[in-house]
C-alpha cells in the first residue's frame, strides 16, 4: 500500500512536458472562464436566440443581393442582370421586412430562449418580449410608427429588454404574485390569467421609463456602447480572436463555440449594418464593417485545415492519405473536426505551431486586404457550412477577389505547414523503420 502511494506521488511529481503545460494553461485560464461565461443563462439565451434568427438574416441578405444585381451603380455602372431592373424594388421590400426588423425578431427569439431555461410558458414569453421591445422604442404615434430602431441598430436594446422583462416575469412567478385559477381550468386560460399582473407591472414600468421620463434606452445604448462595439471591428481584436480560437482548438476545445457568445451579436449587427448601408447607396468597398462570419470562414480554415490536407494528400504515409480522403469532403464545408481530431492536430508537437501560425497570418492578410478596399466588403450572411470559395464570391457581391483571398489563405497554410509536415513525415517513417527492425529481430530470435 505504501509503495502504491509513493508510486502515485512520484508520478504526480513528474515534470510535465511543454505541451501539457500549454494545455493546462489554456484549459484553466482560458477555456474554463469562457465556458462559465457561455453557460450563464442570459448569455446562452442570447446566443441561442441569435442563432434562431439566422435563417431570416440569410434569406434577407440573399434577397438584397438579388435586388442589387438589378440596380445600376452597385457593382458596375449598369445592372449586372438588366432583366431584374423592373422587379428590384420588390426584392427590396422583402429585404426590408426581414433585415430591417432584425431587432424585433431577436427580441422574440431571445425572450423565448431565456424563458425556456426557467420553464416559463413560451407564448407568454414571446408576447412579453415583443411588447417590451415596442414599449422602449415607440414614444410618438402622431406621424405614424417609426421603425428605425427595429433594424440592427436596436439589437442590443432588444437583448436587454427581453432579458430584463423575462427576469421580472420570473420574479412574479416565483413569488406567486399572480392571479390563481382553480383546478380544472384549461392550461391556456390559466397561463393567460397568470400573466395579467406581471404583464401590467412590467408594461407600466417600461412605459414610465420611455414615455413619462422620456428616456430612450436604445439611443442611450448606441451612444454609450456604439463606439466600443464599432472599435471592436479592428485588426487588433480580430487577430487575437483568431489566435485564441485556434489555441483552444489545438488543445481539444471547440474554439468557435467557446468564443462565439462574445462576438456573435456584434457580427450579426455588423453584417446587417453593411446590408443597410449598401441598400442606401454606399459603395460596396466602403461599407462600414469588415469583420463578419463569412470573413472568418474564408480566412481561418483554408489556411489552418486545408493547408495540412494538401500535404496529407501528397504524403508517402498511407495512413495520412487515408485520413485525407476521410477528412477532405467535410473540410470543404469547413467541418474541420475530422482533420483536427483525426490526424490529430490536437496536442501534436509537430502541428500546433503551424496550425495557429497559418490561421493567424491568414487573418492578418485577409483583414488588411479588406481594410485597403481591395475586396468588396461582405453584406450577405450565408449558412456556416457554405464552402469558402462560394461564400467568398457570393457574400462580396460576386467579387472574384473574394475567391482569390481563399486561394491565398490556402497557399499560406501550405507554405507554413511544409517544414513541419516534412519533420512529422520523417519521424513517422523512422517509427515504421524501427518497428520493422524490431519485427525482423523478433522473427530471428524465434527461429
Please identify what each model-predicted range represents.
Residues 12-37, 76, 81, 85, ...:
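Transmembrane alpha-helical segments and their short flanking loops
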Residues 27-50, 87-88, 181-190, 338-340:
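Cytosolic juxtamembrane amphipathic/interface segments immediately preceding
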Residues 35-176, 346:
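Early transmembrane hairpin of solute transport permeases
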Residues 38-41, 103-114, 127, 131, ...:
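Alpha-helical membrane segments and immediately flanking helix-loop junctions
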Residues 59, 103, 107, 111, ...:
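Alpha-helical transmembrane segments in multi-pass membrane proteins
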Residues 67-94, 120, 131-153, 182-184, ...:
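Inter-helical loop and helix-membrane interface segments of multi-pass membrane transporters/permeases
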Residues 122, 135-236:
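Membrane-interface helix-loop-helix junctions at boundaries between adjacent transmembrane segments
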Residues 200-318, 324-327:
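Generic multipass alpha-helical transmembrane bundles of integral membrane proteins
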